[in-house]
């Protein structure tokens, strides 16, 4: 018999009821059965069968697979639209549970249960008191070696604290060994032997497809024939219903050396290498003789290796410096173009600000226009003075004129009489009189402005 199948059947007989044993035996003989056929073999209802199978499934001894089936010759299910025509066609499927023995899963479950049972029995039978190593044959007192360490005879034997008699080692019967653990090992010796045999052999995989290929049909007879069914291989899954992709993920790995894409200063690199060389340098008491001070063979070898490393690093340093110069040249050109563009932008902005300021000043000049005030020097033809009667000049004074848009303004109009033969003395006296008249008239104008009628 197959050792895996034998282990499952013996385990069922050791820990389960008769109904569970019959289910295991039926599956071991027929390889796989659905719930209807298994209920027919055992002569029980589906409800009771599913209760028994549920415990075996929970313990991992049997496995369950659901498979879609349809009756042979059954018409497809159609749905009618508003016009009475069929709109969709679906197959009438029903899913049936098939039971089989998955050897690998059952063996792992049995090993786990055995381990848990051994731990439980060991914890229950563990002694609650400390184990005694020595016993007195006279007074039957028991001691540990630590308790009688201070009472030793000249011969090197441990002595009893009560009667000072030599102590004897405790026998195996007096150590309080766990009897339950012994009994469990004796009862499970057959199962343990089969598990050891399984560990040394190769157990074949028995999944549902393999079990179905080795299935042995049952004989129902003519009085209770089985229904003819068709197997539907396509089974709805998460990938098909949710539209998920089941293709394996592709992983790409890129390996980069230390320093790839990182700009390192050559001086910093040189200092780092020099520091590492000093750390790796041999001490002087090894590289040089402590007596004569001459370099030893080990020191000479180290010096040669250091020289070769320096030569190699020097070549690398030259290449790094050339590459660094190239990078710096490119960076300098980019920076020069950037600063030139920035300077042009600043000049354009300054010129724009200056133009705006000039426009604002022009607007201010337009708003506050200068008004010229008439004076004797500015307007010699029209002098705002009161005319003075002279023998040669007649003056007409036009007094205040009222402006329609503003306050009353004092205006004077002097009309010179045209005469022939005016003397210079008369002109001088006329100018003096005009000046006095102007001063008096300006005072009157200020008074009128201060006390203006509203």
UniProtKB/Swiss-Prot annotation:
SUPFAM superfamilies: Zinc beta-ribbon (SSF57783). It comes from the Eukaryota. The keyword Membrane does not apply. InterPro entries: TFE, TFIIE/TFIIEa_HTH, TFIIE_asu, TFIIEa/SarR/Rpc3_HTH_dom, Znf_RING/FYVE/PHD. One of its GO terms (biological process) is transcription initiation at RNA polymerase II promoter. GO terms for molecular function: translation initiation factor activity. It is found in: Nucleus. Residues 353-372, 442-454 have a biased composition (Acidic residues). Keywords: Initiation factor, Nucleus, Protein biosynthesis, Transcription, Transcription regulation. SMART domains: TFIIE (SM00531). Residues 423-437 have a biased composition (Low complexity). Residues 4-111 form the HTH TFE/IIEalpha-type domain. Transmembrane segments: none annotated. Residues 327-454 are annotated as: Disordered. This is Transcription factor efuD. It comes from Hormonema carpetanum.
């Amino acid at each position: 018999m197959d050792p895996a199948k034998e282990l499952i059947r013996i385990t069922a007989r050791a820990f389960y009821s008769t109904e569970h044993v019959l289910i295991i035996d039926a599956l071991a003989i027929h390889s796989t059965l659905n719930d209807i056929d298994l209920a027919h073999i055992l002569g029980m209802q589906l409800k009771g069968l599913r209760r028994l199978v549920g415990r075996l499934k929970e313990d991992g001894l049997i496995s369950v697979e659901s498979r879609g089936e349809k009756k042979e010759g059954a018409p497809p299910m159609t749905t009618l639209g508003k016009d009475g025509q069929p709109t969709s066609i679906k197959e009438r499927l029903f899913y049936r549970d098939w039971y089989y023995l998955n050897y690998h899963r059952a063996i792992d479950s049995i090993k786990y249960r055995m381990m848990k049972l051994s731990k439980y029995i060991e914890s229950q039978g563990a002694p609650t008191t400390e184990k005694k190593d020595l016993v007195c044959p006279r007074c039957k007192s028991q001691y540990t070696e630590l308790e009688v360490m201070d009472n030793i005879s000249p011969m090197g034997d441990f002595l009893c604290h009560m009667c000072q008699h030599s102590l004897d080692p405790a026998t195996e019967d007096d150590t309080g060994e766990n009897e339950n653990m012994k009994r469990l090992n004796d009862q499970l010796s057959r199962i343990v032997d089969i598990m050891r045999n399984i560990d040394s052999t190769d157990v074949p995989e028995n999944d549902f497809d393999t079990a179905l290929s080795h299935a042995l049909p049952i004989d129902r007879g003519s009085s209770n024939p089985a229904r003819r069914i068709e197997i539907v291989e396509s089974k709805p899954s998460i990938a098909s219903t949710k539209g998920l992709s089941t293709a394996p993920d592709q992983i790409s790995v890129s390996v980069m050396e230390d320093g790839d894409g990182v700009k390192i200063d050559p001086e910093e690199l040189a200092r780092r290498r020099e520091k590492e060389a000093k750390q790796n340098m041999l001490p002087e008491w090894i590289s040089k003789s402590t007596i004569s001070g001459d370099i030893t063979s080990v020191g000479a070898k180290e010096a040669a290796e250091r020289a070769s490393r320096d030569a190699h690093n020097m070549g690398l340093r030259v290449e790094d410096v050339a590459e660094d110069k190239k990078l710096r040249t490119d960076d300098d050109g980019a920076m020069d173009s950037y600063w030139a563009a920035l300077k042009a932008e600043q000049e354009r902005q300054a010129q724009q600000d200056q133009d705006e300021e000039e426009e604002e000043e022009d607007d201010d000049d337009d708003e506050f226009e200068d008004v010229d005030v008439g004076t004797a020097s500015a307007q010699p033809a029209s002098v705002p003075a009161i005319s003075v009667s002279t023998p040669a000049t007649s003056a007409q004074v036009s007094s205040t004129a009222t402006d329609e848009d503003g306050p009353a303004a004092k205006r004077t109009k002097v009309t010179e009489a045209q005469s022939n033969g005016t003397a210079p003395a008369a002109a001088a006296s006329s100018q003096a009189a005009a000046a006095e008249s102007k001063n008096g008239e300006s005072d009157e104008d200020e008074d009128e402005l201060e006390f203006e009628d509203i």
